[in-house]
Amino acid sequence: MTTLDSNNNTGGVITYIGSSGSSPSRTSPESLYSDSSNGSFQSLTQGCPTYFPPSPTGSLTQDPARSFGSAPPSLSDDSSPSSASSSSSSSSSSFYNGSPPGSLQVAMEDSSRVSPSKGTSNITKLNGMVLLCKVCGDVASGFHYGVHACEGCKGFFRRSIQQNIQYKRCLKNENCSIVRINRNRCQQCRFKKCLSVGMSRDAVRFGRIPKREKQRMLAEMQSAMNLANNQLSSLCPLETSPTPHPTSGSMGPSPPPAPAPTPLVGFSQFPQQLTPPRSPSPEPTMEDVISQVARAHREIFTYAHDKLGTSPGNFNANHASGSPSATTPHRWESQGCPSAPNDNNLLAAQRHNEALNGLRQGPSSYPPTWPSGPTHHSCHQPNSNGHRLCPTHVYSAPEGEAPANSLRQGNTKNVLLACPMNMYPHGRSGRTVQEIWEDFSMSFTPAVREVVEFAKHIPGFRDLSQHDQVTLLKAGTFEVLMVRFASLFNVKDQTVMFLSRTTYSLQELGAMGMGDLLNAMFDFSEKLNSLALTEEELGLFTAVVLVSADRSGMENSASVEQLQETLLRALRALVLKNRPSETSRFTKLLLKLPDLRTLNNMHSEKLLSFRVDAQ
């Protein structure tokens, strides 16, 4: 995914995650690594033209997506400008090392850099940064066959597919390392590397949006995302008193984020609530971990399947029986708001709306129970950003149940909810592609806010250093959101239902340049939904996805690893308890982690290709 160094006044360094890269000691632009070859939430600082908030992906040790990443060198066009790139005194800002060997990076261009022999006209640059070839790490000349590549690797791949060349078998078990200086040594490994990083005859450029429109759009998104990232990364906690650690018995209210002065709707209330590290609290029991994480997941997250009118029970039952989610009809569908999301959590709806409109004024607490009983309202016209705004359904507690801290229907005001997943907010006529992306990119703050809130309630998360808290959030947000919204994908019909209750076919969305990523999302959703996770299992799995000790740039990886092991033990105990006869279920669930990393890599590359095409 793309990452932006907020400490670099010249615009930062963008890196590709998941491709094979070159050695930092080579003569072409020095390899720079993002602060997480794992997904890095830093991508949020950049434009967001994909389906989920950009968040760089992380490298998992057994990530199958990189099984070919270390493929051996192969032959290249040495007459190409890329192969002739000469030494550079890379003027990069300091970055975390440890990105997986294969990341395609972007190097800051220095005034002392010597351009390739054929001049700089064929070098792909982005705001003074030079993009590197995903195959060999040389200077990329453009976007070729679906990836950024040098002229040498482009020509090599073209000849390979046009002439259907069968290369000699590799003498090193197909384990050669492909870098610029040795890419000619093993043709088989080089061709294998080309395929593994995504080169394809059928690959097309992303977007096809006019250059001027892209530049305008990217400038606006860059400003908004920079602001959001600066707020998230701020080391100044807003709480005046320490936040009590949640216990299994009660979940304390979370202090509200203080509004930041900004005219940008959707980013004025970006979370800054990460707390500084505290003295280690007593290690909770496994039962406490399960109950606290499950409660936080239930009360903080607004489930995608709930918004689509499916209760948690029906959701799991549907998946267990093989039928798609969100198919159970509800009586409210024909009573006045057919396109509004069925939100079972009023306060979650309030958080969504307040994040978009900057309305949060005071502290709020989480509801203790799932509300029920919708009161319907008519839909409103789209707002200035194109979002369909519908009054959120007002819920009252079941008869006979009136918790002291629950909301009473009579005291509840209507809340307008702008759906974060609504890609085409109100119809599609007259909307250009860039307008759709623009509206969509500005609607993800609520979803990201919920990830931050959820992280704060993971037992032990706030005991980590603030740097590690931020690093984990930057690296894992995209993966968490992918888990959350997996139920929106109907694999059988090859459709996606957004929170506006509008269904789009894979063909429709693929026409916008996201075909490969969407196919991978469908595949992941099918695998995850087939496991029919319970609410508690889904919450613990989400926590495991977020707390990953192999993220690069960690200050105290031992503490993160200890927390991760605690969560894994709790997840394993819960899975075995729920279905003791299915001994392989826990293993199947863990195998979804590398799938998430692969998705994060693809998401990052799509985002970067979108930005580069605007240049």
Curated annotation (Swiss-Prot):
Changing residue 275 to A: Loss of interaction with FBXW7 and loss of CDK1-mediated phosphorylation. Keywords: Acetylation, Activator, Biological rhythms, Cell projection, Cytoplasm, Differentiation, DNA-binding, Heme, Iron, Metal-binding, Nucleus, Phosphoprotein, Receptor, Repressor, Synapse, Transcription, Transcription regulation, Ubl conjugation, Zinc, Zinc-finger. The modification Phosphothreonine is found at residue 275. It is found in: Nucleus; Cytoplasm; Cell projection, Dendrite; Cell projection, Dendritic spine. It comes from the Eukaryota. InterPro entries: NHR-like_dom_sf, Nucl_hrmn_rcpt_lig-bd, Nuclear_hormone_rcpt_NR1, Nuclear_hrmn_rcpt, Znf_hrmn_rcpt, Znf_NHR/GATA. Residues 285-615 form the NR LBD domain. Residues 253-262 have a biased composition (Pro residues). Residues 1-12, 35-48, 312-328 have a biased composition (Polar residues). The keyword Zinc applies. Heme binds at residues 419, 603. Residues 49-285 are annotated as: Crucial for activation of GJA1. A zinc finger (NR C4-type) spans 133-153, 170-194. GO terms for molecular function: DNA binding; DNA-binding transcription factor activity; DNA-binding transcription repressor activity, RNA polymerase II-specific; E-box binding; heme binding; RNA polymerase II transcription regulatory region sequence-specific DNA binding; transcription corepressor binding; zinc ion binding. Residues 1-70 are annotated as: Required for phosphorylation by CSNK1E and cytoplasmic localization. Binds DNA as a monomer or a homodimer. Interacts with NR2E3 and ZNHIT1. Interacts with C1D. Interacts with SP1. Interacts with OPHN1 (via C-terminus). Interacts with PER2; the interaction associates PER2 to BMAL1 promoter region. Interacts with CRY1. Interacts with CCAR2. Interacts with SIAH2. Interacts with FBXW7 and CDK1. Interacts with HUWE1. Interacts with NR0B2. Interacts with NFIL3. Interacts (via domain NR LBD) with HSP90AA1 and HSP90AB1. This is Nuclear receptor subfamily 1 group D member 1.
